[in-house]
Amino acid sequence: MTDCSRNETGALAERVGQVARKTRETDIAVTWRLDGAGRADVDTGVPFFDHMLDQIARHSLTDLTARAVGDLEIDAHHTVEDTGIALGQALRRALGDGRSIRRYGSAFVPFDETLAFAAVDVSGRPYLVFDAALPAQKVGNFDTELAEEFFRALAMNAGITLHLKVHYGRNTHHMIEGLFKAFARALGDAVARDPRVLGVPSTKGALF
């Protein structure tokens, strides 16, 4: 069996996805390096959202670069959703055929009074379950309903099944950040290479 996760020299192939996406509403460029060190360089014009993207990189141990220019004079909806679309597409490209990945990941993350949970299946079957009763409508200038919109856009475009749940909490900032951190930990586990996994981790023989 040929190990397609290695290049012609026998070294593990680099897993990087790059996407540039421009519409009448946004202009976005992202690079996602799955075998990274938790580095982030992001600027979307939405400070709280930048902080959340930093959490994804840091806690998944991936490297993430994102630049977004959007119609923030209206609101942040297009910028956040379209960044999710671009990141989902970049993740899908970085994964290739999914050879040698662990596929599944899950994590509980406590953040003071909040307990958040995430489960990821790199399945090729996009789906989102988002179960979080966020008490505040805004954190800074960030509309909190955009957290769900971001994760939906990412999951649909990456081809992953994603379950997110806040089991309990009171502080909306903590609840959203807990979800981003839990997602990061779960994703990091799911996309990690495992030398025991020969080929694609599916009895169908393909993930995508």
UniProtKB/Swiss-Prot annotation:
Localization recorded for this chain is:
Cytoplasm
* Principal localisation: cytoplasm
**What InterPro entries does the annotation carry?**
IGPD_sf (IPR038494), ImidazoleglycerolP_deHydtase (IPR000807), ImidazoleglycerP_deHydtase_CS (IPR020565), Ribosomal_Su5_D2-typ_SF (IPR020568)
* Any one Gene Ontology BP term: L-histidine biosynthetic process
Q: Which keywords, in A-to-Z order, does the entry hold? A: Amino-acid biosynthesis, Cytoplasm, Histidine biosynthesis, Lyase
Please, which domain of life does this record's source organism belong to? Bacteria
EC numbers, comma separated: 4.2.1.19
Query: What GO MF annotations does this protein's record show?
Result: imidazoleglycerol-phosphate dehydratase activity
Q: Which GO terms describe its cellular component?
A: cytoplasm
Pathways per UniProt: Amino-acid biosynthesis; L-histidine biosynthesis; L-histidine from 5-phospho-alpha-D-ribose 1-diphosphate: step 6/9
Report which reactions are catalysed by this protein.
D-erythro-1-(imidazol-4-yl)glycerol 3-phosphate = 3-(imidazol-4-yl)-2-oxopropyl phosphate + H2O
Does Nucleotide-binding show up as a keyword for this record?
no
Has the keyword Lyase been applied to this entry? yes
Task: Note the HAMAP family from the entry.
Answer: HisB
The similarity comment for this entry is: Belongs to the imidazoleglycerol-phosphate dehydratase family.
Q: What is this protein called?
A: Imidazoleglycerol-phosphate dehydratase
